[in-house]
Swiss-Prot record:
The keyword Cell cycle applies. The keyword Membrane applies. This is UDP-N-acetylglucosamine--N-acetylmuramyl-(pentapeptide) pyrophosphoryl-undecaprenol N-acetylglucosamine transferase. One of its GO terms (cellular component) is plasma membrane. It comes from the Bacteria. GO terms for biological process: carbohydrate metabolic process; cell division; cell wall organization; lipid glycosylation; peptidoglycan biosynthetic process; regulation of cell shape. UDP-N-acetyl-alpha-D-glucosamine binds at T10, G11, G12, N124, S195, I252, Q297. It catalyses: Mur2Ac(oyl-L-Ala-gamma-D-Glu-L-Lys-D-Ala-D-Ala)-di-trans,octa-cis-undecaprenyl diphosphate + UDP-N-acetyl-alpha-D-glucosamine = beta-D-GlcNAc-(1->4)-Mur2Ac(oyl-L-Ala-gamma-D-Glu-L-Lys-D-Ala-D-Ala)-di-trans,octa-cis-undecaprenyl diphosphate + UDP + H(+).
Length: 369
């Protein structure tokens, strides 16, 4: 089996593709992969480290206003399609899979023009621009949220979940809180604003630390590497010291390992976070980012709130007191946390990679028919 994967720009498009590749390898050890990414996206740093063959295309997104930028965007897209056709001709894939981002638009569109089976995967509750564009020509479409199905042709779309969920669920964690000086027998909340950190979350945490110091549970705060020094500076300016039950870290290398030992999480509501949280059945406090296309994080969060699997705090309502109140609700009331964990588990799809793999086989079978 020969597979071209394409997705780029953010980790939310890349990690599901890499997780899917792991599942395919489990079924087909001789499978060969080629990942086609963008020159500017983070995939250029992430994919080569996995040992997967990697090629780059020059693409860029559209501006909301009419401009010369958009003319160049179209020119780059057409050139990227031409280069993609050459790559496809040389690699001879059985299927081409797109997981979002502008680069996937060029690669999957080229494959569609060459009559090669294509599968696209939508991680969010609101379909992205690229996947909307590719939907008509796609052989099959997998989505991570039930609500996303209505945005695609009904005869093609299947609810499969996010392959990242299966990757996390299958992981055997050896992590201990003792490695950062905490105890394994105490309830622990992880507060994480994403790989770059979230200033709004960090500021709320700073306000909350004096009260967190008095709690029986443990608090692990991940600031983001670029914001770590700023958080420490603000704590010093305000004469706030963190007690022994609190740890402040710039980043965590292996988040899935840590999540398996976490009793509650405070995070943004990105697709990857939602997949991980539900796969592991972790009660969560979600603070959707306002700076995303189509406000999809709010809708992602609402999908968990609606089934009682999460608490949602809007950024405008986020402060030290609202954060403490929400964490107390999860970690000081076992009935609440147990119910939320059960509901998160119900909506989680720990076999998402397997579901998407089966959809890919269907797409390939359609071609043979």
């Amino acid at each position: 089996m020969r597979v071209i994967l394409s997705g780029g720009g953010t980790g939310g498009h890349i990690y599901p593709a890499l997780a899917l590749a792991e599942v395919i390898k489990q079924h087909e050890p001789d499978a060969e992969f080629l990942y086609v990414g963008s020159e500017r996206g983070v995939e250029a740093n992430i994919v080569p480290k996995t040992g997967m063959a990697f090629k780059q295309l020059a693409v860029q997104g559209f501006s909301r206003s009419l401009s010369l930028h958009n003319i160049k965007t179209v020119q780059l897209f057409l050139k990227a399609v031409k280069v993609s056709k050459k790559i496809i001709k040389e690699f001879k894939p059985d299927v081409v899979i797109g997981t979002g981002g502008y680069v996937a638009g060029a690669v999957v569109y080229a494959a569609q023009r060459m009559n090669i089976p294509t599968v696209i995967h939508e991680q969010n509750s609101v379909a992205g621009v690229t996947n909307k564009f590719l939907a008509r020509g796609a052989t099959k479409i997998g989505v991570a949220f039930e609500v996303a199905k209505q945005q695609f042709p009904s005869e093609k779309v299947v609810l499969v979940g996010n392959p990242r969920a299966q990757q996390v669920a299958q992981l055997k964690s050896t992590f201990s809180w003792q490695t950062i000086g905490l105890r394994d027998d105490k309830a622990t909340v992880l507060i994480f604003g994403g790989s770059q950190g979230a200033p709004a979350i960090n500021l709320a945490v700073i306000d909350a630390i004096p009260e967190f110091n008095e709690r029986s549970y443990q608090v692990v705060i991940v600031t983001g590497p670029k914001r770590y020094d700023n958080v420490l500076d603000l704590l010093r300016e305000r004469n706030i010291e963190a007690a022994d039950n609190i740890r402040i870290l710039p980043y965590i290398d292996n988040m899935p390992n840590v999540l398996k030992q976490t009793d509650a999480i405070v995070s943004r509501a990105g697709a990857t976070s939602i997949a991980e949280i539900t796969a592991l059945g972790i009660p969560s406090i979600l603070i959707p980012s306002l700076h995303v296309t189509g406000d999809h994080q709010t809708k992602n969060a609402q999908s968990l709130v609606d089934v009682g699997a999460a608490i949602n705090i809007t950024e405008s309502d986020l402060n030290g007191q609202s954060l403490i109140a929400a964490v107390d609700t999860l970690l000081l009331d076992e009935n609440v946390s147990d119910k939320m964990a059960a509901q998160a588990t119900k909506v989680g799809m720990p076999d998402a990679g397997e579901r998407l793999y089966q959809l890919i086989l269907q797409a390939m079978a359609n071609k043979k028919d």
